[in-house]
Amino acid sequence: MVPDQDGELRHDVCSLSTSLRLTAHVTSSIVHEQSSNIRYGENRKHGQRYAYHEPLPPEIVARCNGHDGKHLTLVTRNSKPVNVRLEKRGQSFYISKGWKKFVELTDLRVGQCVRFSVSSPSTLDLLILDKHGTSLAIPPSKRDLKLKSKRSTHQDSKGHPSNTDPGPSRIINRRVTKSESSANTQLLVQYFSKRYPIDHLEQLMTGRTEDIEVQTLVGPSVNMVLHTSTDHRCNLKKGWTDFALSNGIKLNTVCIFHFYKTTHLGVIVDIF
């Protein structure tokens, strides 16, 4: 039995991906090295909504080789891609043409936050967060979860797990290279022992410690342990560091965790 979005119980795959959608980050900031937070609002005048925003961060403009009149595509999980145009005002850049359409499609509200990430010189990936820092992205569907559970995982000649479905190269390429500094690794070990309030997970857990399958939507799964600490919080242990390294997760990376339970406890990690 699993509660649906209205709180009613139904027979199906047990999942917390919709109700939980935790946005985990390692510091008080959710700014990735290639992204920034922009706050948006709305004004009502003559019955119409007007969206306004601050200038795009200089690092975002630089990474997408921005210039006055440049056309970009905004990509978000909440709506279809939107073509926009950059406009330079003084020393700052704003999104002009196409912005109103994007606001209407995503229904941006006062106090929400948009996190930009440059995926190519002409494409910006956007993650929309509410005022509490919780992602408003659409979680994996039941079909995604079922496909993931059926996906076979094999081992290569060295005994490492490898998936038959390589998935989007955007995910695969997010690997930590050998040039990564040891300082990054140390920070990762220190801050990435993921912790979650127990009240969100107790309906899925049967004991104080439970085995859990951790995976990205397209990558191989890793078996870890979800442990309840004395301060009534849950921690991912025994494998998180290797998982983070192999998926390019480091300090200030934003991760969204979708917990579910079928025949076993699992979590799908979205990496931004």
Curated annotation (Swiss-Prot):
Q: Name one GO molecular function term.
A: DNA binding
Q: Where is this region: Disordered?
A: 139-171
Chief location bin? nucleus
Q: Identify the InterPro entries for this entry.
A: B3_DNA-bd, DNA-bd_pseudobarrel_sf, Plant_B3_domain
List, alphabetically, the Gene3D superfamilies matched: DNA-binding pseudobarrel domain
Q: Where are the transmembrane segments?
A: none
Give the organism, scientific name. Oryza sativa subsp. japonica
Q: Which GO terms describe its cellular component?
A: nucleus
Residue spans binding DNA: 39-132, 180-272
Q: Is the keyword Repeat in the record?
A: yes
Which spans does this entry mark as compositional bias, Basic and acidic residues? 141-159
The molecule here is called: B3 domain-containing protein Os10g0323000
Going by the UniProt record, its keywords in alphabetical order are:
DNA-binding, Nucleus, Repeat, Transcription, Transcription regulation
Q: Where in the cell is it found?
A: Nucleus
